[in-house]
Structure formats: C-alpha cells, structure tokens
C-alpha cells in the first residue's frame, strides 16, 4: 500500500538498536572462578584484620619497644656483595609481598588472556574506572600536601590502591549478597589497581638502578619462563630460579615485588595443543594460583600487615596531631572521597558517552557502594608509604594513621549503603543461584554455558 502524503513509510525503517548494558552478568565459568577467589580472600581478610589489630595493640602497649625491636631486627647476610642483611619489616615488605605480587601477576595474565579483560568491550569500563580511581585521589593528596613542601607530595600514590582482602572481609561482616556483576567489577578493579600500583612503584619509587644486576636478573627469569612454558612444575627447579630473580631485582634498586609480577607474567594461562588444549583443563597459571593464593592471603599479606600497621599513636594528643597533619588528611580524603568519586564518575561518564545502560538489576547507588569499598586501601598503600617516606619515619607513622582511618571510614560508609540494598541483593542472589534442573549450572547461565 502506498502511503498517503504526510505519512511516514515505516516498512523499511530499521528497528532501533538495543543499548548495551554495562556491569551485566558474565559467564558462569568466570562467575564461579571469581566466587572461589573471593571466598579465599575473605579468610585472608579476616587474618589480615587480626594481624593489624595485634600490631596496633602491641605498638601502643607497655611492651611497645619489643614490637619495634622485633620489626627492626636484622636477619641475613651479604654474600657476594648482595645487600640481603635486612630487617624483619623489610623482609616482609620486599620478600613476602613478592609472593602476593606473584599471585597478582598470575591473576592479571589470566584476566587478559582468558578472563573478562580479554574482551575490550568488557575491559574498557573497569580499566577506565581504575584509572579514574587513581587520578582523583592522587590529585586530592597533592592539593592537600603541596603547601607543606619538603617532599610531602612524594606519597601521592598512597591513596590510590585497593585492598581486595580487606574489602571482601567487610562484605562478609555485613553478610551482604552482592550480585555477581558487582563482585566481578570489584575484583577486576582491584586487579587493574594492582597492575597500576606495580607500574607506579617501578617507575616513581626507584631512586637508583644497578643496570648490571637488572640485566643479570633476565637470565633466571628467562630460565623460569622456559621451564613453565614446557609445563615443568618441579619446585626444586622453579623455586631457586624465582629466588635468584628476586635477589637480582632487589639488588638492582627496582622494588623486589616487581620480580613477583614478572615471574607471574611468564606462566602460561592456556594449555598448549600438545598438552590437550584449553579443553583438557586449567592451565599452569591457574594451577600455581590455587597453590599460592592461600600462602599469599593467609601468610604473606598478614605478616606484612603485622610489621607495617604498628604505629605508636601516643594517646589522644598524638592521634589529634596525626589526624591534623596534611599527609594524614590527604590520605583520608583521597581514600574516602577521591577513590569512590573517581571510580563512580568515570563509570557514569563512560556509560553516557557509549550510550549504554546500567544493567537492569543494578542502580547507580550500588556502583557507588562498590566504589567506596575500593576506597579501602591497606596493603599496597602501606607499602607505598614505606617507599615514599621511609619505614619508621614520622611521616610514615602519619601514613599508617591515614590509611587505617581512611580505610575504616570508607568501609563503614560502604557497609551502610550496601546493607540498605541487601534485600534487593538477596533477591538477585536467589535468582543467580537457582538451579531447578540440578545440573550444577544456575538457570540464568544456561544460555551461556561454556
């Protein structure tokens, strides 16, 4: 039928394209993997909190001198001129945290090769949000501390980190059923945060570089890579190569935790064709991650926190002095205001620019609640504080007060926001876990089963 004048011909008009949803539910395999990681991190977070509390109580008790004497006790030697006669606090920061960053390297590579970050469309949002969550708190810290001078701005990266173990411990305490999409977003944010943190540590907190030691570190690193590419799992071979890499990176002047990330990056994520291909089971990276994550979350990070979190507050007057210092204020404002605002605004702007919609199961208040959880910066924040101002210095003490206070305030506000929404989260959780045919895959994931 020919349309009359003034009438639009709708027969050939294309249907409007549906808008893409952001923070939508991912695949079942990825959701299940992330749930397993967060369960382990919850236990690690509890141990982390206990270790930090013990350190704080001990450092402010009549036996405080014994705590600081233990932290500053030197153990080691200097064979072949290598500087390995370190304090226990330094061994924890440089040595044990290398295990933590090894797991970070494994996780990063898996995310980029087989996880959500392999898809540019899904990776763009958390990566941009992580950058926003780094830039805004850094700017706030610099604005607050710049008038002080005397190198106060050197700690600009302190309020930019996220402690996933601390964050999921908060979720466990408030018993919230966070939807899978938000859990994935939080973990991916933390993973990208760790990548940015390693880059910042290597670039901005390295004063002098011993090029000879750095060049020599390539030899054991390459041998380690050769072994894992050939799927050699023998720890009697891999461990000495890993330790040798760590020693030489430490000697080079680059922070030794970078060695952990580099070692993690060498481990293959997918099985080779000769080993049966991806369908034959998880790759070596996932195998190592399962083995090392309990050591990282349950031992390495809590021991570091024990030696790093102890600060002699000095009563009410000392706490007042610390809280009024620009470094402390810059960290608190960076974590509580800068971090969530940076993540939230970046997410909101990117969603608007790409003409996408937030997933139907979520509201923007949910995104802000997760952004507040990302404001819990602990492990990496304390490490950067040590690097920026020196372990045991007055400014390092202000860093500890700022990180502890800022993380606590961010956790409390996030807990209130997320707890208010918990009834809705529970309804989403029931939908995401319903498995009427009892085949092990929840019904909502049946169409994307992989």
Swiss-Prot record:
Molecular functions (GO terms): sodium:proton antiporter activity
CC terms in the record's Gene Ontology section: plasma membrane
Residue stretches in coiled coil: none
Transmembrane spans: 43-63, 86-106, 124-144, 155-175, 185-205, 208-228, 234-254, 258-278, 299-319, 326-346, 364-384, 398-418
Keyword line: Antiport, Cell membrane, Ion transport, Membrane, Sodium, Sodium transport, Transmembrane, Transmembrane helix, Transport
Reaction equations catalysed: Na(+)(in) + 2 H(+)(out) = Na(+)(out) + 2 H(+)(in)
Top-rank lineage group of the source organism: Bacteria
Topology of this chain in the membrane: Multi-pass membrane protein
InterPro entries in the cross-refs: Na/H_antiporter_dom_sf (IPR023171), NhaA (IPR004670)
Subcellular location: Cell membrane
One record GO biological process: regulation of pH
Family named by the database record: Belongs to the NhaA Na(+)/H(+) (TC 2.A.33) antiporter family.
Function: Na(+)/H(+) antiporter that extrudes sodium in exchange for external protons.
Name used for this protein in its record: Na(+)/H(+) antiporter NhaA 2
Organism: Mycobacterium sp. (strain JLS)
């Amino acid at each position: 039928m020919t349309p009359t004048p003034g009438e639009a011909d709708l027969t050939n008009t294309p249907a409007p394209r549906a808008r893409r949803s952001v923070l939508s539910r991912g695949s079942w395999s990825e959701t299940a993997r992330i749930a397993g990681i967060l369960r382990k991190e919850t236990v690690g977070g509890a141990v982390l909190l206990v270790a930090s509390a013990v350190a704080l109580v001990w450092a402010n008790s009549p036996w405080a001198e014994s705590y600081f004497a233990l932290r500053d006790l030197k153990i080691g030697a200097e064979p072949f001129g290598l500087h390995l006669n370190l304090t226990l606090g330094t061994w924890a920061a440089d040595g044990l945290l290398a295990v933590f960053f090894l797991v970070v390297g494994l996780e990063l590579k898996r995310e980029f090769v087989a996880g959500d970050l392999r898809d540019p469309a899904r990776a763009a949002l958390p990566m941009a949000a992580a950058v926003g969550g780094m830039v805004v708190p850094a700017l706030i810290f610099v604005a607050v501390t710049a008038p002080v001078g005397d190198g106060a701005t050197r700690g600009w990266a302190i309020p930019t980190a996220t402690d996933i173990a601390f964050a999921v411990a908060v979720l466990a305490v408030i018993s919230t059923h966070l939807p899978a999409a938000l859990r994935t977003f939080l973990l991916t944010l933390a993973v990208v945060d760790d990548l940015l943190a390693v880059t910042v540590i290597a670039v901005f907190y390295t004063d002098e570089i011993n090029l000879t030691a750095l060049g020599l570190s390539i030899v054991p690193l390459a041998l380690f890579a050769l072994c894992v590419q050939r799927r050699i799992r023998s720890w009697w071979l891999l461990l000495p190569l890993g330790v040798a890499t760590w020693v030489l990176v430490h000697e080079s002047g680059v922070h030794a935790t970078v060695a952990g990330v580099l070692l993690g990056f060498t481990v293959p994520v997918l099985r080779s064709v000769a080993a049966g291909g991806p369908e034959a089971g998880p790759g070596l990276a996932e195998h190592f991650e399962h083995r090392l994550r309990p050591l990282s979350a349950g031992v390495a990070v809590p021991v570091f926190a024990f030696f790093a979190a102890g600060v002699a507050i000095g009563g009410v007057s000392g706490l007042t002095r610390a809280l009024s210092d620009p470094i402390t204020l810059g960290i608190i404002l960076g974590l509580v205001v800068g971090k969530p605002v940076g993540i939230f605004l970046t997410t909101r702007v990117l969603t608007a620019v790409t003409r996408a919609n937030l997933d139907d199961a979520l509201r923007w208040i949910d995104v802000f609640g997760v952004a507040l959880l990302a404001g819990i910066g602990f492990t990496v924040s304390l490490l950067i504080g040590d690097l920026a101002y020196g372990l045991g210095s007055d400014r390092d003490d202000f860093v500890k007060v700022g990180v502890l206070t800022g993380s606590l305030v961010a956790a409390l506000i996030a807990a209130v926001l997320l707890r208010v929404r918990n009834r809705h989260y529970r309804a989403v959780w029931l939908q995401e876990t319903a498995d009427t045919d009892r085949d092990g895959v929840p019904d909502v994931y049946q169409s994307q089963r992989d």
